[in-house]
């Protein structure tokens, strides 16, 4: 039988499976968000606080998207994992394949991101 002793700090890191934080949009077309996540996330969810996840602008036939999902297997339009997976690259006013416009850095909007181990 082999015992392994770990510190309380190590145990807490192992038990941490979710990391949440917030960033505020500044309307830059491309922005990198350093998450300070204590682990390498395998998935991330970004959503706006106090804003509808997507807004349909009927007169202009545009769908404004304020949410994104990403994993080590791929991401939705407007979100990229940097090589370290702790830095998120988000886009503002990025055109999609139809009439959607990705808005992950809208000025004044608070975005919550959830990193999952």
Language-model segments: residues:
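Surface-exposed ligand/attachment interfaces on beta-rich extracellular proteins
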Residues: 19-39, 49-58
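Aromatic sugar-binding interfaces of carbohydrate-active proteins
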Residues: 41-43
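Short, structured beta-strand segments at or near domain termini in extracellular proteins/domains
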Residues: 99-117
